[in-house]
């Protein structure tokens, strides 16, 4: 009887595994009745902060540190934080610090979607990061950020907020949009930089043997860089799927390179 139960359990696990593996680009898809993850809290995307000590707005009229074309490194934090305030852990701070140290002539931006004060546990980390003259920590308002871009009407329609992973897909949108608007480099908050990027242009990392990664990539202000950035933003808009986690991140840069290079094999 025990063996039968074990075999039944094993068979059930295999069936679940098969169901979870998509036949499209080997991307794991969402199975609604099996989704036990916490629903993304995205209320901060539309919330107006009344905090007097909240971080400065990016692209505000009072901003004196307008991004320099192509000389920027962007990190985005798209989580919404509660009453405890904005949080940044030591690993994330290490990623930002490494980018600033290895690229002293580039401006490193950490952009939060949630606007609030920093949590007590984060104050010391932030103070240390801001000791670097090329580090900027700002708040970004998605509704304003998409204005006068190919994504303005699309974002206003509310499609992204209906995603199964709105926070992750917001991050996908912002990384391509930041490079479209200003040029430069985007890095995930778990990427530690060990060398200079200052002479590296128009690049992306490898996700695996089939897909290009969206966690490390750069588009400069050259004709090629502008073409890549524009193609990625338009692919994101055209092929966005809220039910496929990786379709809007690595999927975008992979499809774009396949199209521009006229090949299925870009790795």
Regions found by a protein language model. Give the residues of each.
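Glycosyltransferase-associated regions of secretory-pathway enzymes
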Residues: 1-171, 189-267
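Small-residue hinge/turn detector
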Residues: 172-182
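Residues at helix C-cap/C′ positions in short coil/turn segments immediately following an alpha-helix
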Residues: 104, 182-183
């Amino acid at each position: 009887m025990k063996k039968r139960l074990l075999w039944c359990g094993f068979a059930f696990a295999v069936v679940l595994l098969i169901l979870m593996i998509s036949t499209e680009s080997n991307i794991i898809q969402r199975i609604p009745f099996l989704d036990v993850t916490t629903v993304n809290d995205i209320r901060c995307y539309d919330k107006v902060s009344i905090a007097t000590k909240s971080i400065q707005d990016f692209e505000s009229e009072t901003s004196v540190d307008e991004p320099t074309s192509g000389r920027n490194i962007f990190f985005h934090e798209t989580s919404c934080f509660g009453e405890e305030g904005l949080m940044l852990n030591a690993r994330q701070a290490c990623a930002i610090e490494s980018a600033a140290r290895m690229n002293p002539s580039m401006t490193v931006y950490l952009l939060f979607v949630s606007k609030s004060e920093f949590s007590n546990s984060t104050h010391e980390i932030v103070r240390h990061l801001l000791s670097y003259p090329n580090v900027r920590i700002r708040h970004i308002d998605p509704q304003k950020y998409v204005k006068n871009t190919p994504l303005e009407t699309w974002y206003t329609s509310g499609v992204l907020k209906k995603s199964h992973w709105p926070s992750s897909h917001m991050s996908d949108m912002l990384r391509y949009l930041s490079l479209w608007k200003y040029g430069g480099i985007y890095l995930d908050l778990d990427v530690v930089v060990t060398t200079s990027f200052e002479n590296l242009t128009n690049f992306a990392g490898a996700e695996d043997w089939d897909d290009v990664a969206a966690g490390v990539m750069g588009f400069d202000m050259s004709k090629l860089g502008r073409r890549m950035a524009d193609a990625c933003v338009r692919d994101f808009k055209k092929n966005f799927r809220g039910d496929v986690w990786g379709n809007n991140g690595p999927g975008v840069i992979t499809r774009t390179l396949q199209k521009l290079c006229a090949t299925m094999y870009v790795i």
